[in-house]
């Protein structure tokens, strides 16, 4: 008599998200982590770290965190703002991600020029103006008040849930900026953001 085949247990796909910020980005991606890890534990698992480092040091920290996980991460996302950091450091992270990626683990540079608030603003409309990041916050407050969501603050913990209904708009607008910035390095893509690539990867679970 033939023995019954044993069920093959498929491991979930592990993602590590390491952010430069310790408030805004961890709160936004932490909300995504909570939803996905709760609803799809057998398919995909996320871990979010807000470490406070920037550009190259952020990449090195992400690489170290990835090594420390016994499960092994399939994707490591390095989320950072360009702010006023040296252009060579901003662009070097992209190169490091490419150089360090293998068949087992893929590193992604998720930059925003100038800051993640650009990604938030793109939920409400297309914006191509190269303005200083300090001008994003009053614009965000204006947009949020129009939908009855109050004022913007970097330590708000509800931004993902507020913006979720407008996610498709943000992705489309970010892709339009990406097309305009084609061929430019992150430091020259003003404005621009790659957050949409991470969100698109996770969107089937949201």
Predicted segments with their positions:
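Short acidic, Gly/Ser-rich segments with clustered Asp/Glu that frequently serve as metal-coordination loops
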Residues: 21-25
């Amino acid at each position: 008599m033939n023995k019954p085949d044993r069920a093959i247990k498929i491991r979930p796909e592990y993602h590590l998200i390491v952010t430069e910020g310790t408030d805004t980005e961890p709160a936004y991606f932490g909300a995504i982590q909570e939803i996905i890890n709760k609803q799809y534990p057998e398919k995909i698992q996320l871990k979010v770290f807000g470490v406070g480092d920037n550009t190259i040091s952020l990449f090195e920290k992400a690489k170290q965190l990835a090594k420390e996980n016994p499960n092994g991460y399939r994707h490591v996302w390095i989320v950072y703002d360009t702010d006023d950091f040296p252009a060579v450091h901003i662009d070097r992270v992209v190169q490091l991600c490419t150089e360090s990626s293998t068949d087992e683990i893929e590193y992604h540079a998720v930059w925003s020029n100038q800051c993640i608030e650009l990604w938030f603003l793109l939920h409400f409309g297309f914006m191509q103006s190269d303005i200083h990041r300090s001008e994003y916050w009053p614009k965000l407050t204006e947009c949020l008040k129009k939908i009855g969501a109050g004022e913007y603050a970097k330590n708000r913990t509800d931004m993902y849930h507020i913006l979720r209904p407008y996610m498709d708009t943000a992705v489309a607008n970010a892709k339009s900026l990406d097309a305009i910035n084609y061929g430019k390095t992150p430091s020259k893509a003003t404005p621009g953001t790659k957050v949409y690539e991470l969100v698109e990867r996770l969107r089937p679970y949201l």
